[in-house]
Amino acid sequence: MEKFRVIGSTQPLVGEVTISGAKNAALPILFASILAEEPVEVANVPHLRDIDTTMELLKRLGAKVERNGSVHVDPSSIDEYCAPYDLVKTMRASIWALGPLVARFGQGQVSLPGGCAIGARPVDLHITGLEQLGATITLEDGYVKAHVDGRLQGAHIVMDKVSVGATITIMCAATLAEGTTVLDNAAREPEIVDTAKFLNTLGAKISGAGTDTITIEGVERLGGGKHAVVADRIETGTFLVAAAVSGGKVVCHNTQAHLLEAVLAKLEEAGALVETGEDWISVDMTGRELKAVNIRTAPHPGFPTDMQAQFTLLNMMAKGGGVITETIFENRFMHVPELKRMGAKAEIEGNTVICGDVERLSAAQVMATDLRASASLVIAGCIAKGETIVDRIYHIDRGYDKIENKLNALGAKIERFRESN
């Protein structure tokens, strides 16, 4: 199993980094390509394990898929309608295959998915939404099976709770439904907006993405087209926090400030100088005192849960005692005990973590537990005294495109290695 060896330093992280395309947009867009009857080209797709798994899954369904810079998908040859367990077991996003399959082919089945172990992420909202569009759903032998005679039917759907994943499933399926679908209490994340842009490029008629009411006028078919994936706002935020906690200055290119306004506001509150341009953001912490901030995670445009672990680390290194409340997922403080192994001060009370400040962390052997928490451990290693070993880095590879190379370019000392048995 691969690990990171991180040599800590008091030197600030300084330099420039190019942000990759957003995994959370690239995945639904690749699955949404199932809806098309002609070839599509998707640019700015990050190099990640989940992307590779998705491309393999599309191939298993019969699509022609190749990557040379952009990802090219020809879904016209799809002739299988089942996403099998051996591919799905590592990745929750595979549920996004179900809506497009039943919408275009009248049938689809997906093995109940795996992925990060952060709380309950039931597929109920996906299933309920597809049922309201007229699909018959059954659970058999560990598979979610969907079927419809003829086309799905447009409907007025009010989501029981805000869900990014279910919003994408319903929006994608409704593009080929007969009639108009109105989706109320929809999630508003930038990745949903980007998926809608992609579908509209292929001929869909979607309006209101980015608001809590999305309207989809069903069309009979989708053609081909080209699309570039939106920047990864979480990767952007991760590198900006790395600059802040190390007392450095980092410029992130190929990203936009409007994608993470809540994060930038909290960085400014923490004492950082934040500057933005059309396609870049910089954080400068040189000679500034890091101040703790209070955070409450919330659906977009609130503070993103995927930045919670990074700001937990920030609060541990900052003056004062910051309080972070997690409202999206339960069981999302698994990074806290690992950071405490490095000398951090923090107490968990229910869905809240209260951080104390320490002068400097000490190196330790720590274990990555989920995708975003893992990044906070790597950054902690960069600023700790001594040599930190981060285990189970496959979690990081699921969401960050060459994180060690990008951090090393800023002055970090991170080595990927495989421990011999």
UniProtKB/Swiss-Prot annotation:
Q: Which GO terms describe its molecular function?
A: UDP-N-acetylglucosamine 1-carboxyvinyltransferase activity
Residues annotated as binding phosphoenolpyruvate: K23, N24
Active site positions, chain numbering: C116
Which positions in this protein are listed as binding UDP-N-acetyl-alpha-D-glucosamine? R92, R121, P122, V123, D124, L125, K161, V162, S163, V164, D306, I328
Give the record's GO CC terms: cytoplasm
Report the Gene3D superfamilies cross-referenced here. Enolpyruvate transferase domain (3.65.10.10)
Keywords from the named record:
Cell cycle, Cell division, Cell shape, Cell wall biogenesis/degradation, Cytoplasm, Peptidoglycan synthesis, Pyruvate, Transferase
The entry sums up its family as follows: Belongs to the EPSP synthase family. MurA subfamily.
Q: What is this protein called?
A: UDP-N-acetylglucosamine 1-carboxyvinyltransferase
Species in which this protein is naturally found: Vibrio vulnificus (strain CMCP6)
Organism phylogeny? Bacteria, Pseudomonadati, Pseudomonadota, Gammaproteobacteria, Vibrionales
